[in-house]
Amino acid sequence: MQLNKVVLAYSGGLDTSVIIPWLKENFSCEVIAVVVDVGQEDDFETIKERAYKTGASKVYIEDAKAEFVKEYIFPTLKAGAVYEGKYLLGTSMARPLIAKRLVEIAKKENADAIAHGATGKGNDQVRFEVTIKALMPNIKIIAPWRMWNLKSREDELNYLAQKGIDIPFKKEESYSTDWNIWHLSHEGLELEDPWNMPNFEKVLMIIKNPFSLNDEPETIEIEFEKGVPIKINGKEMNCVELLKYLNKKGAEHGIGIVDIVENRLVGMKSRGVYETPGGTILHYAHRELEYLCLDRATLHFKEMVAIRFAELVYDGLWFSPLREALSAFVDKTQEVVNGTVKLVLYRGNIYSAGSKSPNSLYIKDLATFEEDQMYNQKDAEGFINLFGLPLKVFGMVNKKAGDSD
C-alpha cells in the first residue's frame, strides 16, 4: 500500500526511531514526527535531530503541559478517580491528549494515516486508537508492532544498521518508563516478579527513598476553588508551576510511591512502580476538602462515580459521551468545594492538619456533645422508629417458628 503522508507519535526512543524508516520502506510515504511535551523533561532538540536523521521530513514539538494539567489532570482530580484503589492514571490521562494532537496535525498536514509505537500487549495501543477513531473516524491507523517481524531490541538495532542509520542506542539495562508532569512509571526487569520488593535506591528517579530520609515535618496549605487547586501557602500559581512545586515538595519527603499489580484492559495483569509526588498530595488535600463541603448523599454517590470515571480514563475513553457526562456531574458537585487544606509532609506520609471553607457543612453547634439549641435529642426516637421500620417489618414477617416475641 502506498500512502502520501503519515503522522507518527514520536518519542525519540529506539522503537519509534525504527518506525520512521520502516514506514518509508513499507508505505513509500513521507513521515511527519510529532513529539508532545507533557512534562517529560526530555532533550527535545536531540530528539528532533534524531527524527530527521532516521528519515522524518518534518518534526513538530508540541508543548501541551498546560493543556494536560488543566483539561485532563484537574478534571480527573476533581472526580477523585483512582484506578483499582492505587493508580493515579498518569499515563492513561496523557495518551488521549497526545492522540488529539496527532489528529490536529494530521488534519493540518492532510495526512493519510497516523502511526504509533505502542506494543500489541499493552493498554496504550487501545488508548491511542480509540481516541483517533473518536476524533478522526476515517483516517488509517498504523501499529507497526502488530505488523512487523522485528521481535527484539537487537532486531531493531540491526534494522537501523541495514538502513545505514547510526544512532548510539545502548543495550536495554533499565526499566521501561513513562514520564510526564503527573507521574513517572517503572516496569520490567526484577519488577516482573511480584514477590520482589522494589529496590528503591535503583528504581526511584524523582522521589527520595522514604527508608533513608532524615527530613523534618513540613506544613503546606493548598487553596482550592471549585475543586481546582489555585494557591500554595497563599501564593497564586499557574497550573504547571503549582504541580511542579508539589512534585518537588512531595519528592523531598518521600511521598507518592505506588507499587501495584494492576489489571490491564487487554486481559493480563502487570506490575509497576509509580512515582506521583504532587498528585498524591493533591488527591489527599482535595478529598479532605470534600469531607468538609459535600453532603453525605453526594459524597457517597460521587465515590461510585469516581470508580467508573477511573475505568473510563484507564481504558482510553476520554472522549466518550459517558466520561463527558460524568464530568458534568462532577463539575456540579465541585461548585461548593472551595477552601484551604493544611497538610504536614513527613517521611513518606501526609497528615491532615486542618481545613476551612466558606462552604463548610460542619457546624460546631450541631456536632458538639454539649447542650445546644439546634438539635433536640428527643427527635431521634421518632427518626429511629421510621428508619428501622423496614427491618422491624421483615423481622415480624419472617420470624422463625418457635421464636418468642
Curated annotation (Swiss-Prot):
CDD domains from the UniProt entry: ASS (cd01999)
InterPro entries registered for this protein in UniProt: Arginosuc_syn_C, Arginosuc_syn_N, Arginosuc_synth, Arginosuc_synth_CS, Arginosuc_synth_type_1_subfam, AS_cat/multimer_dom_body, Rossmann-like_a/b/a_fold
Catalytic activity: L-citrulline + L-aspartate + ATP = 2-(N(omega)-L-arginino)succinate + AMP + diphosphate + H(+)
Main location: cytoplasm
Annotated residues for binding of L-aspartate: T119, N123, D124
Gene Ontology biological-process annotations: argininosuccinate metabolic process; L-arginine biosynthetic process; urea cycle
Pathway recorded for this protein: Amino-acid biosynthesis; L-arginine biosynthesis; L-arginine from L-ornithine and carbamoyl phosphate: step 2/3
Residues reported to bind L-citrulline: Y87, S92, N123, R127, S176, S185, E262, Y274
UniProt keyword terms in alphabetical order: Amino-acid biosynthesis, Arginine biosynthesis, ATP-binding, Cytoplasm, Ligase, Nucleotide-binding
GO molecular function terms listed in the Swiss-Prot or TrEMBL record: argininosuccinate synthase activity; ATP binding
Localization: Cytoplasm
EC number(s) on file: 6.3.4.5
Keyword hit for Nucleus: no
Annotated positions binding ATP: A9, Y10, S11, G12, G13, L14, D15, T16, S17, G117
A Pfam family this chain is assigned to: Arginosuc_synth
Highest taxon of the lineage: Bacteria
Gene Ontology CC: cytoplasm
Subunit architecture: Homotetramer.
Entry's family note: Belongs to the argininosuccinate synthase family. Type 1 subfamily.
Name of the protein in question: Argininosuccinate synthase
Species whose genome carries this gene: Caldicellulosiruptor saccharolyticus (strain ATCC 43494 / DSM 8903 / Tp8T 6331)
Gene of this entry: argG
